Swiss-Prot record:
Domain of life: Viruses
Family membership noted in the UniProt record: Belongs to the anelloviridae capsid protein family.
Gene Ontology cellular component list: T=1 icosahedral viral capsid
InterPro entries in alphabetical order: TTvirus_Unk
Name of this chain's protein: Capsid protein
Functional note: Self-assembles to form an icosahedral capsid with a T=1 symmetry, about 30 nm in diameter, and consisting of 60 capsid proteins. The capsid encapsulates the genomic DNA. Capsid protein is involved in attachment and entry into the host cell.
Compartmental location: Virion
Keyword terms of this UniProt record: Capsid protein, T=1 icosahedral capsid protein, Virion
Disulfide bonds, paired cysteine numbers: none
Length: 662
C-alpha cells in the first residue's frame, strides 16, 4: 500500500489518554528486519494570511450617570371651525382669531423635536419623569403614540422617520384627503361609532430616525433635529363626494364682473375700470332714488373713484367750478366707493363713462351708460374639472398698470394645470409659509382662469358674501376693522369663503355640517436616556444652608428640567473639578457666551422649516478668543501661527525627523 494511502488518524486528547506503564524490552537475537508501515503521518501545515475585515465594530463608552426619562403628554393635531378646512392648523395655532370667525385648519404638518417637548413642558402640557439637570448627553430610544378617535371626523395620519425633514409645495398639496389616502404609509383613524367594540385609539410605536446611530448625542446638537414628522388630514369617509345637507355636488360662486373691472390696482386715484391702452372709463352713480329715465346731469353725479376708503360719496359744490374739477385729487372727499352697502343696493344704478369735456358745465348731459351688474353668479362642477388649462395666480391690489389677465413675473405666484379643488386646498397656505411676497391678505387678490366654470368670463375674481353685503349705515363703524375701513376693495381676505367652498368639493374633503368644529389629538410617551458626569460640587450642599419648606414633609419637590438646547459648555463635568475647586480652563469656559443654533420660523416650534432655511452659524471658540483678545495679543498669535507654518514647510523639504526644534 503506498504511503500516501495511509489513513490519517484523529488527534486524541493527551490529557485523557491512558498512560501505559514503562517496560524495558528484553534483548533478542538480531534477525532480518521486516518491513512495517509507519503509523505516524506528517502533519500538513497551511500558511493562512489574515484578510481585511469587511466591517469593524465601534464601541462607545457609557457615561458615568444614566437616567431613563419618560416624557408623557397630550398633543393637539388639529382643530378646525366650519368654513376653514383649507388651512394649515400649525400656521395659525398660536394666533388670535377674530370674533365670530372660524379658526384652525383641517390638516397639519408638524415635527417633534426635543425643543418642542421642552416648550410643551414650559406650557404645562407634558411631564418629565426624570430630571436632565447637569446631564448634557441624550439617547433617544422610542416613542409610543396613541391616536384617539374623534367624535366628529375621521382623519388620516402619516409618520415620516426618514429625511429630508423639509416641506415643499407638493407636501402641502399631498395633504388633500384623496391624495393622502393614496400614500401607502398612511393609516386611517376612524371616528367613534365605526365598530362600537373597537379600541378608542390607534396605537403606534415610532423608532428613532433612520439616520440616527445608537450612540450618545449632545442634547444641544439634536435640539432642532426632528425625531419624526406627522402629517394629519381630516376627511369624511361617509360623505366622500356629496355633503348630506346639499341637494347637488355643484356650487355657486360669485365673481367680480371682469368685463367691467379690468384694472387690478384699486389704489389708483381716481380709479378707472378699463386697461391703460384703451380710453379711460370711470364709474358714477346717483343717490336719492334717481330714475334711469331722467336726464343724466353732471350736477347730480357722484364720482366713484375712491376704491380704498369705505365711503358712499357726496355731491360736489357746483358754484364757481366745472365738472372737470371733480376729478382733482384735492376733491377726493367727494368721491365714493362702489363697494359700499349703499352703492351696491339694487335701487342704486352704477354707470360707466369717460371724463367730461373741457366745455361741459354742470347742466350738461353726461354721456354715461348703466352697467349690467357688479358681480356674476357662476357654477362649478368638480367632476368636470380635469385641471387642463387652469391658472390661479396672485395680482397686487396697490401697484401695477396691468389688468387682471396680466400674469405675474414670479413663478411662485402662479400655479397651473391642476384641478381647482386641489389648488385651493393648500397653495395659498404654501405661499404664507414660503413667503415669496408679504401681506397676502391685504395687498394681493386671487385670480382664476378656468374653462370649467360657467358662464365663461375672461377671469374670475371671487368675492365673499361679507364683501357683497357689507354692514349698512352706521353699523359699519363697529363691525368693520380699521384696516377694512381704509382698504375696502377686493382682496384675498374677502375671498376666503369662496375659495373654501371650492376646496370642500374635493374628494373626501371634510364636511363640517353637523357640528361647528372638529378636533383630533394624540397621547405620546417618549423614552430618553440622559447621561453625563455631573461634578460632585453640584450635588453636595451644606445641610445648614438647605432651604426649609413650609409644606408638609411628605410633599415631593418638582423636577428641575433644563432646556435640551442649553450649550454643552455651560455644564460642569468631573474633570472640571480638582481638589474640590474649579479648574482654570473650566472657569474660563464658563465666562464665555455661547449660543444654540435655532431655526427662524414665525409659526412655532412644531412647524417644519423650509428647504432654504439653514441653521444659524455658531461662532467657533478660536474666533471668539481672537475677537476678545487685544490687538497686540492677536498679532502675536498670528505671528506664532505663521512661524509654525514655515517650520512645517522646512521639515517637509529636508525630509528629516524632528530631532530638535528649529
Amino acid at each position: 500500500m503506498p504511503p500516501f494511502y495511509y489513513r490519517r488518524r484523529w488527534y486524541s486528547n493527551p490529557w485523557r489518554r491512558k498512560r501505559l506503564r514503562f517496560r524495558r524490552r528484553r534483548l533478542r537475537r538480531p534477525i532480518r528486519k521486516r518491513f512495517r508501515r509507519r503509523r505516524w503521518v506528517r502533519r500538513r501545515r497551511f500558511f493562512r494570511f489574515k484578510r481585511k475585515l469587511r466591517k469593524i465594530r465601534i464601541d462607545q463608552w457609557q457615561p458615568e450617570t444614566i437616567r431613563k426619562c419618560h416624557v408623557k403628554g397630550n398633543l393637539c393635531l388639529l382643530t378646525c371651525g366650519r368654513g376653514n378646512i383649507n388651512h394649515n392648523y400649525i400656521l395659525t395655532s398660536e394666533s388670535y382669531v377674530p370674533t365670530s370667525e372660524p379658526g384652525g385648519g383641517s390638516w397639519s404638518i408638524l415635527q417633534m423635536t426635543t425643543r418642542v417637548l421642552y416648550d410643551e413642558y414650559k406650557a404645562a402640557r407634558n411631564w418629565w419623569t426624570k430630571s436632565n439637570s447637569l446631564l448634557p448627553l441624550t439617547k433617544y430610544i422610542r416613542c409610543k403614540l396613541k391616536f384617539y378617535r374623534s367624535d366628529q371626523t375621521d382623519y388620516i395620519v402619516t409618520i415620516q422617520r426618514t429625511g429630508p425633514f423639509e416641506v415643499t409645495l407638493e407636501s402641502y398639496l399631498s395633504t388633500q384627503p384623496s391624495r393622502h389616502l393614496m400614500n401607502h404609509k398612511a393609516f386611517i383613524v376612524p371616528k367613534l361609532g365605526r365598530g362600537p367594540n373597537k379600541e378608542t385609539y390607534v396605537k403606534k410605536i415610532v423608532r428613532p430616525p433612520a439616520l440616527f446611530q445608537s450612540k450618545w448625542y449632545f442634547s444641544q446638537d439634536i435640539y432642532n433635529t426632528p425625531l419624526f414628522i406627522l402629517t394629519v388630514s381630516s376627511c369624511s369617509l361617509d360623505q366622500m363626494y356629496a355633503p348630506q345637507d346639499q341637494i347637488s355636488t355643484n356650487i355657486s360662486l360669485f365673481s367680480l364682473n371682469t368685463n367691467v373691472f379690468q384694472i387690478n390696482n384699486w389704489h389708483k386715484q381716481p380709479y378707472t375700470t378699463k386697461a391703460a391702452s384703451t380710453l379711460e372709463t370711470y364709474l358714477y352713480c346717483y343717490h336719492n332714488g334717481h330714475e334711469p329715465t331722467q336726464e343724466l346731469k353732471w350736477k347730480d353725479i357722484i364720482l366713484l373713484g375712491n376704491m380704498t376708503n369705505y365711503t358712499d360719496g357726496k355731491k360736489y359744490n357746483t358754484s364757481g367750478t366745472t365738472p372737470l374739477d371733480l376729478f382733482k385729487t384735492e376733491n377726493k372727499p367727494y368721491w365714493g366707493n362702489v363697494f359700499t352697502n349703499l352703492n351696491q343696493d339694487q335701487d342704486v344704478i352704477i354707470y360707466y363713462g369717460t371724463k367730461p369735456k373741457q366745455d361741459d358745465n354742470w347742466t350738461s348731459t353726461a354721456p354715461i351708460l348703466p352697467i349690467t351688474s357688479l358681480y356674476v353668479e357662476c357654477r362649478y362642477n368638480p367632476f368636470k374639472d380635469k385641471g387642463t388649462g387652469n391658472k390661479v395666480y396672485l395680482v397686487p391690489t396697490d401697484s401695477g398698470l396691468g389688468s387682471f389677465l396680466t400674469l405675474p413675473t414670479k413663478s411662485e405666484l402662479i400655479i397651473t394645470d391642476l384641478p381647482l379643488w386641489l389648488i385651493t386646498w393648500g397653495w395659498i397656505e404654501w405661499l404664507k409659509k414660503s413667503r415669496p411676497v408679504a401681506h397676502i391678505e391685504e395687498e394681493y387678490q386671487v385670480v382664476i382662469q378656468s374653462k370649467y366654470i360657467h358662464p365663461q368670463l375672461p377671469c374670475y375674481v371671487l368675492i365673499d358674501k361679507y364683501f357683497r353685503h357689507p354692514p349698512e349705515g352706521q353699523h359699519y363703524i363697529t363691525e368693520l376693522s380699521e384696516t377694512d375701513k381704509l382698504h375696502w376693495h377686493p382682496k384675498y381676505s374677502m375671498q376666503t369663503e369662496q375659495l373654501e367652498l371650492i376646496a370642500e368639493t374635493g374628494p373626501a374633503a371634510p364636511k363640517i355640517n353637523n357640528t361647528k368644529q372638529i378636533e383630533a389629538h394624540l397621547n405620546y410617551d417618549f423614552l430618553f436616556k440622559w447621561g453625563g458626569s455631573p461634578a460632585p460640587m453640584e450635588t453636595i450642599t451644606d445641610p445648614a444652608e438647605q432651604e426649609k419648606f413650609p409644606s408638609p414633609s411628605n410633599q415631593l419637590q418638582g423636577l428641575q428640567i433644563e432646556s435640551p438646547g442649553k450649550p454643552k459648555q455651560y455644564y460642569l463635568y468631573t474633570f472640571d473639578e480638582k481638589r474640590s475647586e474649579l479648574t482654570m480652563p473650566a472657569a474660563k469656559r464658563l465666562k464665555k457666551d455661547f449660543t444654540t443654533p435655532t431655526f427662524f420660523t414665525d409659526f412655532g416650534t412644531k412647524d417644519i422649516p423650509l428647504k432654504t432655511q439653514e441653521e444659524t452659524d455658531q461662532i467657533s471658540e478660536d474666533e471668539e478668543i481672537e475677537t476678545s483678545l487685544p490687538k497686540e495679543d492677536h498679532l502675536k498669535q498670528q505671528l506664532q501661527r505663521t512661524r509654525q507654518y514655515y517650520r512645517e514647510g522646512i521639515r517637509k523639504l529636508l525630509k528629516t525627523k524632528k530631532l530638535f526644534p528649529l
